[in-house]
Amino acid sequence: QRAKLWNKNTIPPHVLVMTATPIPRTLAMTVYGDLDVSVIDELPPGRKPVKTFHFTDAKRLKVFAFMKDQIKKGRQIYVVYPLINESQKLDLKDLMDGYESIAREFPLPDYAISIVHGQMKPEAKDYEMQRFVKKETQILVATTVIEVGVDIPNASVMIIENAERFGLSQLHQLRPRAWADEQG
């Protein structure tokens, strides 16, 4: 489609390419001078910046206390894992063990937890996501299957286990899933 426009005109059109997470090809084009770069370095009016913290496993109880405080304020929480099941080769937290740990710390009937991962049938994933969207659950334990197409303003906290196992683009894609709401 762009090629037709270029061939149709004697003066080449200006092309504006926008991305929040550049793919390697786009990044290479900017590095090697094939694209001019404009930077939007401020947030839209009224949007609070996303706060990022790093905690080691030794601070897990502090993280759980923070989660409980956020849930008391009516907020929802994402907890993202790099693996669904335990790996024989990698020493990482996995979703299934993480879910069990969270379920012990956040028991029914006071708390409800959804679980979503790529090995689930689409109907089961949709059901669990809808429970989270409808605020029937306060915590969504998931893999990066939530990376695309999930925008729940009430879910203002995201915990990413073993964040070093994710690529920078993946982390950048996940970040907006947890927006800071107006209450701070």
What do these predicted ranges mean?
Residues Q1-G184:
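Inter-lobe coupling/hinge segments of SF2-like helicase ATPases
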